Amino acid sequence: MTSRHFFYLLFWLAAQALLACHALAADTARSFAQVWRISGSVSAAVAEPAVARGLRVGDTVYVGERLQAATNGEAVLRMDDGGYLAVRPGAQFVVDDFAADQSGSDRFSLRLLQGGLRLITGWVAKLNPRGYRVSTPSATIGVRGTDHEAYFLTDTLAQTLSQKSGTYDRVVSGQTYVETRDGSVDVAPGQVGFVRAPPPPR
């Protein structure tokens, strides 16, 4: 075996080990959804430094994975409680907690880091609406059984779209509320709630 072949073999073994670690971490986590539809590039990563896997139709996605859509990427996830989550281009988010046992302890906690999602809630929001949370760097969104779109525009995204940076929540049906340390406001169908992004650290 030449030194070049040996190098390639070591590189291949290292890559396989990284993928195996990713699969092991995913296998020991709780699933929250399956990929129902997808176009372009959408990936899921377990940890930092992340080992990402490209998602395909039928793949399972897990609590704790960081999902990221490229600028050409979109996906629809069918959640384990019968709800749907549409991932918009450029979105990044993590589902930190999920339980769907059709009981009062059901819960869903999502951290939206940037970009937009559309969420059609399943039975978690119906059985335990207080256990449903979508958080961004500037606000927390709760629901009362609904179809809504949540966005967090970073400074870069806001400049690109000629909008203000911050959290946006548009309600299609049902009702949500947007909450900060200063209080909360209800958002009805056809309305958009907005909270400015926090100032950069000094």
Task: Give the residues covered by each predicted segment.
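Flexible, surface-exposed loop/linker segments and immediately adjacent secondary-structure boundaries
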Residues: 24-75, 79-200
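Bacterial N-terminal signal peptides
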Residues: 8-20
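N-terminal secretory signal peptides that target proteins for export/translocation
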Residues: 1-6
